[in-house]
Amino acid sequence: MRQVVRFSLLFLPCAILSVVLIGAGVLRWALWGMSFGIDFQSGLIERLRIAPPAFSLVYTGTQSMQFFQDEQKVVFTVSSPGVLGERYEFLYTEYPTLRAFSEGAKKVEHLSVTLHAPETVYMRDTFSGAEGSTLSSASCFVHYFSEDVRAPGVEELRRVLKDVPSAVVQQVGVRAEHTFQVRVAAETAFPSSLLPEQGGTALAQSDAPDLVTPQGAVESVVYAALVRAYGADHVVRLAMDFVGSRFSHLLVRQALLLVLGALVLIFLYVALRFRWFFALGAIVALVHDACIMVSFMVWFGLEFNSASIAAILTIIGYSINDTVVVFDRVRQTILLDPIASVTTVLDRSQTDMLTRTVVTTVTTLLAALMLYVFTEGGSRDFSLALMVGMVSGVYSTIYIAGGCIALISRGKSGGQLLGL
């Protein structure tokens, strides 16, 4: 007969240990705060691409010329104040290549087209930084991608912007489009060397190593770093937006409501499948896991962002699965021996499931460990939070959920607990 491990002897010491760990995290948060990621801060969100120029447009007329481009055509509209002038449309089916387009554009007065790419490049492979723009004597670049063009990856852009504090780079959309999203917190201290010059004068004094830049300068710092790496004619700014502090606070509240909503649904599920005290034990264990993960992030200075929320929700699902399996064995053990005390039933059930718990946790930990070793940045922090959560999940299933049930059923047998 298998020897039963007396887990119940450590219910109280482990509960005290958990309170101390969580309390230490709360204390550090209260004294030094938490490092929130750009997801929960006000700041710049910019969508961009890095691509070579296909051609440039210059308009020297006295009227206003609007330029528009989509996936099928290029359109020029000439107008005066209060008067809509001529409209020139160049369909890609009629003007398939740069050469054909540049020849056709000669009929537009005061417009000059300068090619920067081979004449055989297809117009359908070109794109502009915005859907519409006003042309002037300054060059307006239109860019392109083709199979022979080397496009930078997300890791390369992260290296380019590594000196920009709080900059987060992600690839968005279809991978073949090579579109990136850059986020930078608004109130960030930038080294003066990163700040662009305006009219020959730097935005900051050279003897000031760091400063908090105004909101508009955040955009300039990111653009200057990209221009230094790729050149102004290769940086395509698709869209820019600033997220205010009010919106970022709303995201924090929504994240908290998301976690609370998940806990409520899990409580209802466990209560319907077992009994309310099982559900209470499960919820206490899940809240414990979430608090341990947050405390770990606070103590080790990890950034709390949307990936952290994903890690917490992942661990909540992982932990409740383990807890439900143990609770199911607890119910079976009670039906087999309704006279045994609740602590005895818990010890037997957890001993029976110990091998499964260890094997499942170790194999999942190995997967998370590989993610931690072979990635960097946000993915590495995510995997580290997962590993902490997995260890906490096993610990809480045995000592927190079990201890909660033992506390509720003091002096009762397993049969009395289930009303048998």
From Swiss-Prot:
The lineage of its organism: Bacteria, Pseudomonadati, Spirochaetota, Spirochaetia, Spirochaetales. Its main location: membrane. NCBIfam families: 2A0604s01, transloc_SecF. One of its GO terms (molecular function) is protein-transporting ATPase activity. This is Protein translocase subunit SecF. Gene3D superfamilies: Multidrug efflux transporter AcrB transmembrane domain (1.20.1640.10). It is found in: Cell inner membrane. It comes from Treponema pallidum (strain Nichols). Forms a complex with SecD. Part of the essential Sec protein translocation apparatus which comprises SecA, SecYEG and auxiliary proteins SecDF. Other proteins may also be involved. One of its GO terms (biological process) is protein transport by the Sec complex.
